[in-house]
Amino acid sequence: QKHILTGKQLAADYKVLRATLDSIDPSIKIAGVDVAYQIPIVGSLLPTTSEFLEHGGMESIDFLTWHWYAMESKRCPFHGRFAPATQKGAISTSTMDKGNKWANRMNALVKKYQLSVELWMGEMSLVSCGGAVNITDSFAGTFWYLDELAHLAVQGHSVTFRQTLVGSRYGLIEQSSLQPLPDYWGLLLFRSLVGQRVLGIEVHNSQGRFVRAYAFE
């Protein structure tokens, strides 16, 4: 707890980084502040990001970013901060809804501070700390991934980064064989079929959260 970086300190550090990079090449872009909501030991998302913005952090960055993991790996439990990884949880609508809630809160910060900035998802996967066997490396996690890509686009996120391309159990490509994993094919399908413009759409039926529809062109 003694070594947590505060939003105020991060704003000061990013100011130094901005000045350093400007002295080398002013065209270099900076994305930040890259905080995940579940991990208070390294700074909780809303308090840290709010404090960062209050102390002028936005003057030093070009893209406002945050990190998101929907479930918890056995490798590094965070004492109930989020649900343990299971296949049932991977396809649960409540798991899918969580990311939407936090994206809403990040958008609220953008409006509160009247920011004219692109909102990015700087890092995400269904399960934290390397993922989980038979979940993030299987089609069980692909439903969540596709829904996450769609709703983040609807929520105004210009860019979404996956954790990770190759490595552990949440990569898009298997580390030893270099064979594409299910989420790779899901992403390829998404990129092949989905356009760059989000269209407004609503679902009016009794299924509510269980039927999801997104439209792009």
Regions flagged by a language model, labelled:
Residues 213-217:
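Short amphipathic beta-strand and strand-loop transition segments with alternating hydrophobic
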